[in-house]
Each structure stands twice: as structure tokens, then as C-alpha cells.
Amino acid sequence: RRGFFLSFFPSDTPHYENVLPDGWCLTDIGELLINRDGERKPVSSVIRSKQTSKIYDYYGAAGVIDKVDSYLFDERLLLIGEDGANLLSRNKNNAFFAEGRYWVNNHAHVLDATDKNLLDFIAIVINSMKLDDYITGSAQPKLSQDNLNKIPIVLPPLAEQQRIIAEIKKWFTLIDQIEQGKADLQTTIELTKSKILDLAIHGKLIPQDPNDEPAIELLKRINP
């Protein structure tokens, strides 16, 4: 999937201005989005363990990590991991959405936009990128707010953003179907193997020959 992302967004940042299609522009996260990190609050595991209702998602750097009794946000916003190994490994998307009522701790940046349609496109761009140049620390990788704001965004017109998103979703649906087909095939293979073994050990895999020596006779020879 990342290769598909990268086909839309080349990584040669210094030359963006020379290759931009008509109507596109070069900007960055800081200029384009509204940072709402000041509204997030961490809740310690000790406090969370004492809560009883626990009906709202509690987000960390890579997604939901717990449930809590209350919420900070009640709208769809874009979250981007602030720290943790996933920033470099990208085993999960570094940009993801939170919806409904939820709480965000201080390990995920909270981003909003004057036109929330922008957020879907930005999520695609961020998840297509290697963020190494904007991350500090090796033992504990961190994407600071300052560095997050510097990430360049090649921005098409809003209508074209929507067409790009629709095209990506179409291809991802096809990819998911292929992956599911492979998973279903693997499941079928495993079930078939199990069934063959089950038939074999119950004497039903092949026709039995009444002239075969009984197994009890074999056992007597092995263990007189």
C-alpha cells in the first residue's frame, strides 16, 4: 500500500515547485492545519484503573489503548503519533482518525482544519511518508510539534483531493479483497489439511483392504 501512496506523492521535496500540476501548491502542516495539542490530557494508568464507567476511547500514539469515564473531544479529528517506535517502523498508520466522543493523551498530536475535508487528504500524505527526517531520538523516537509543523504538503485543489481519495479507496478495496482472498485460501488449505489428517487417523481416507494384517498383530510384533 505504501508504494501506491508514494506513486501519488514523490519524495524529492526540493523540486516540488518545479513539478507541481496546475492549481497545486506547496505548503506545510503548520500553515495548513490547526493544532489542538493544548486540549489533550494524559490520565495515568492508576487513575484509569479506578474508573468504573469506561465508555469512551482513550487514544495514545498509535490508536485506542484504553477506555475512560469522560471525554475531551466530540468531533472527528486527525491524530498523529507523537512518540514511540511506530513512528519509524510504521507497523500501524501514524495518522489516524478519532470520531465520536473520546479522550487523547499527550502521545498523539491532535489536528483540526477550517475545512475538515482537508484532514482525509493529509492523513493519506502522512501515511505515505517516511518521517525519519522529522523525528528526534533513537531509543524513544519523537515527532515534536515544531517538526510536525515543518512537514511539507503538496496540496491539490479540494475537488482534486476528493478525486484522489476516491481513487485510492477504490484501489484499496480491491487490494483488501485480494488479501482477504489469500487469507480465505490459506484458511481453506489449513482446514483441508486438518480434514485429511482426521480422515486418515480414522481409517476413512482410503478404502480398507480386509486382507491387511490387523494393527493388533503389528503391535504384538513391536511389543511382544
Residue ranges and their predicted role:
Residues 8-42, 49-60, 150, 158-165, ...:
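Non-catalytic DNA-recognition/assembly elements of restriction-modification systems
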Residues 18-23, 46-51, 68-72, 100-102, ...:
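A general structural signal for short secondary-structure junctions and capping/turn motifs
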Residues 60-127, 136-139, 143-148:
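A short beta-sheet element
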Residues 209-210:
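Charged, heptad-repeat coiled-coil alpha-helices that serve as long linker/dimerization "arms"
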